[in-house]
């Protein structure tokens, strides 16, 4: 028996060694290319330590940064003095042995180091593909699919609010809730399938089963709330689409230049200067906002054909936008005359019919001595005729920036309501589910609906719960989806 055990152990070890040698050790530059203060080269795989020893003579203790002299393995020339970090498997990002070299960020230093790794003489080593480090982290159980998708969003975040939302996903918030749902669904399915053999004609009406379907219904409501909440968070991921509209010479171009902190649009006292929609992405108190400056809305014989096209584009942008800013001058006569124009009035009414958030900016307060007196009747008119809340009517000066801080604060509050809608107290659905994840949730919800509709037929109900469980598994990658995995990992840059 001992001989058989020894033979089995030797065979297993030989197979394991062959398997390990089949896994390539990968390396890549993990920081952006180009000259910088520091550049990080990452090496991951079964031969990572051998590569490091070839370049530096030794490997430091795990998780202790140590200074090492990096030499070319062929020419024996010094390349750089670098900090070396060793992360022993499985306690690394990839779950494999990982060595990181923190080099000086010169182009030659990086290029020669990468060449030295390639010429180290270590077998089965190659440059990493985009996202391959993250792919290994997934397959080695170091991260689930939602955490890696969250990591993509963290890397791509351009504003603070995008970053905060992405970090919830990257740190496992979506995984945690999916784990809870999937665990409960597996329990429900087990109960239903176990009941098939003991129920008469597969019909159930006992108290325990009734309670199960009540819980299924509650779970479906929770999932539906998260689907809707995810749609709102998608606005944050892509940027909030805001159209700036109003009459000519109201200060729309001045506003977009002010918010962008650079000259985007031409500012001129001549009417009709802006002909086409001009877009710019800006950061407003952490929210990514895609601003569109549009042609002034007006009618008249002096409106040229090309300006008419610009006005049609402006109205189309109002239709597409998620929030509309209407800009008017402080002069009440000019304000009332502007509202008499059907182009402006109908656009306001369309936004109200669509229940789209609107903010009114009464601009050029620096041009009058007592703007509060002139602002009062304009605000009263908007409140009375369009039921616009007081906190969405603002007196500002794009020239002196008066009133700008209060306006941006009010605008941020509206953005907050758009991306974090109020929900039932029992359901806090404010996670950033992306489109792929929401599709999985929608499919799960559909299967739960069918299970609830067929609650009298235990066989059908059990099958639908099984399919719903698989849909939740697809969110985190617990269910195999090779084609989806490759798409997600390809979104990472080389070195991540």
Curated annotation (Swiss-Prot):
Pfam families from the entry?
A: MMR_HSR1 (PF01926), MnmE_helical (PF12631), TrmE_N (PF10396)
Q: Does the keyword Cell membrane apply?
A: no
Annotated residues that bind GTP are located at: 246-253, 293-297, 363-366
The organelle targeting sequence, given as a residue range: 1-19
What are the subcellular locations of this protein? Mitochondrion
Function recorded in the entry: GTPase involved in the 5-carboxymethylaminomethyl modification (mnm(5)s(2)U34) of the wobble uridine base in mitochondrial tRNAs.
Q: Which HAMAP family match?
A: GTPase_MnmE
Q: Which PANTHER family match?
A: TRNA MODIFICATION GTPASE GTPBP3, TRNA MODIFICATION GTPASE GTPBP3, MITOCHONDRIAL
- This one is known as tRNA modification GTPase mss1, mitochondrial
Q: Which organism is it from?
A: Schizosaccharomyces pombe (strain 972 / ATCC 24843) (Fission yeast)
* Gene name for this UniProt entry: mss1
């Amino acid at each position: 028996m001992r001989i058989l055990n020894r033979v089995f152990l030797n065979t297993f070890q030989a197979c394991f060694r062959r398997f390990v040698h089949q896994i390539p050790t990968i390396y890549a530059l993990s920081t952006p290319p180009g000259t910088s203060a520091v550049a990080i080269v990452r090496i991951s795989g079964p031969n990572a330590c051998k590569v490091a020893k070839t370049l530096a003579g030794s490997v430091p203790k795990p998780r202790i940064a140590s200074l090492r002299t990096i030499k070319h393995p062929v020419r024996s020339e010094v390349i750089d003095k670098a900090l070396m970090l060793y992360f022993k498997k499985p306690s690394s990002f990839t779950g494999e042995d990982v060595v990181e070299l923190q080099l000086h960020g010169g182009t030659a230093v990086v290029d020669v180091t990468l060449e030295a790794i390639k010429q180290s003489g270590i077998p089965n080593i190659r440059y990493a593909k985009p996202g391959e480090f993250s792919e290994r982290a997934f397959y080695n159980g170091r991260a689930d699919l939602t955490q890696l998708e969250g990591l993509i969003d963290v890397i791509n975040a351009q504003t603070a609010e995008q970053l905060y939302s992405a970090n919830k996903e990257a740190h496992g918030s979506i995984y945690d809730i999916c784990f809870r749902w999937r665990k409960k669904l597996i329990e429900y399915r087990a109960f239903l399938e176990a009941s098939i053999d003991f129920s008469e004609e597969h019909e159930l009406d006992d108290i325990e089963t009734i309670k199960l379907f009540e819980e299924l219904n509650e779970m479906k409501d929770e999932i539906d709330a998260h689907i809707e909440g995810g749609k709102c968070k998608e606005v944050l991921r892509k940027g909030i689409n805001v159209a700036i509209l109003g009459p000519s010479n109201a200060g729309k171009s001045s506003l977009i230049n002010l918010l962008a902190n650079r000259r985007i649009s031409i500012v001129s006292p001549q009417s009709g200067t802006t002909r086409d929609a001009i877009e710019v992405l800006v950061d407003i108190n952490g929210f990514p906002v895609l601003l569109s400056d549009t042609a002034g809305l007006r009618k008249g014989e002096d409106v040229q054909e090309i300006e008419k096209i610009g006005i049609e584009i402006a109205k189309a942008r109002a239709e597409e936008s998620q929030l509309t800013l209407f800009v008017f001058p402080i002069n009440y006569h000019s304000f009332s005359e502007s509202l008499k124009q059907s182009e402006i009035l109908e656009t306001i009414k369309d936004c109200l019919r669509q229940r789209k958030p609107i903010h009114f900016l009464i601009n050029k307060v620096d041009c009058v001595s007592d703007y509060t007196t002139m602002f009062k009747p304009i605000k009263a008119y908007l409140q009375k005729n369009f039921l616009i809340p007081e906190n969405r009517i603002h007196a500002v000066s794009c020239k002196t920036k008066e009133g700008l801080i209060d306006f941006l604060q009010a605008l941020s509050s509206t953005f907050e309501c758009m991306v974090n809608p109020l929900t039932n107290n029992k359901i806090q659905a404010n996670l950033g589910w992306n489109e792929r994840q929401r599709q999985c949730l929608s499919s799960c919800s559909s299967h739960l609906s069918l299970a609830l509709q067929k609650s009298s037929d235990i066989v059908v109900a059990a099958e639908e719960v099984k399919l719903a469980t698989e849909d939740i598994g697809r969110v985190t990658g617990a269910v195999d989806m090779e084609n989806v995995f490759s798409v997600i990992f390809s979104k990472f840059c080389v070195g991540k």
